[in-house]
């Protein structure tokens, strides 16, 4: 019996036994195969240059577009537990060093170099141990010290604002998910300021900058809810019911109003950026039932009249210039009519330092739409093949969904000089607990002795568990190979996983 034209159909059974799939695979096989190899090589090389974890890439070739699905693994819970069992306490704070921090922009790292010149007004930093093994009273104590210092700052705002007027960096809001602000029903701990006056001459007298924090609100709310409250002061929700009421909407009178607001709130010469809803929409900042905001551009002294506009601070100056050039953002030099609070620059500076301490240690995940290299890769692949290319990155928390994820775990611990015999015992114990895994086979070649004397010798060790038959069509085998760079040389790792 001769070889089948399409032998892969024997394993796929009822999926690939159609006439059209047979001639399509024969005619376009070489072209699709070369593109698949190129896309896998390009994406993994691109991620490697930016120190991203190696992804499992799946490509779907269509008639009018190409869809690429890279799958990343962020096994925080399993890696931390495995590090504890192997005794890597000194590396415990970096147990997920190959995961979410590479999805965070480098602009947020600039805040770590931000220094406060005044020694009498320190900002307490949150320790890294707070997220692993510290008690709850340490977290509450840090919050109380922060808010206590914030109250002391209110007494010296007159001369402190001039010192921090040039320090205006909103990059700490770049990677905060806007979903935290949706369905926000809790009472804010910050007293909001309402502009409800109709007299143009008395508007300056009705503005206040109260930011009083009660101890009861601090004890009841967790750090996540506190982060929501702080973010709400920057993202003005579309559900605001109070706004400035104008009787005379001439450009001259409105400029006087904004001038008085700037004098009281000390935010003059400050550029605020509003998203133009005609060219770009941000659905994450609004609820599903809410209508898109409509506001006019600030040309020929025109004023925004919509009462449901919201502010969106763009953190990157280069990104702002590009978006303004493309017409996505309309730059204005005034405040929208629904702005409630008038926080000073020094308070904004303290919010930056406090939020950066939270976000710098939490290593929170990001959604698919916030992947910073998505547009770049799509544009490059589209121009390369003259066809629409789409990238859909996914993040997985379970490392047993692919053999490549298990190989990355082995590489992580071998590079930290953990012997392969200790690693295989932990992995086989985890494999027995997975209901959808039929068997696993791991082969390691090189100096895999760890810190012992056996590390001087290069050996090849293999471990098997369950059924991993490579010559049976019914077995769903997944294969991956990795290379670990150790101080003793390179170590080759191969993993086979058989799924049920």
UniProtKB/Swiss-Prot annotation:
GO terms for biological process: translation. Signal peptide: none annotated. It is found in: Mitochondrion. GO terms for molecular function: RNA binding; structural constituent of ribosome. Keywords: Mitochondrion, Ribonucleoprotein, Ribosomal protein. One of its GO terms (cellular component) is ribosome. Its main location: mitochondrion. Belongs to the universal ribosomal protein uS3 family. This is Small ribosomal subunit protein uS3m. It comes from Prototheca wickerhamii. The gene is RPS3.
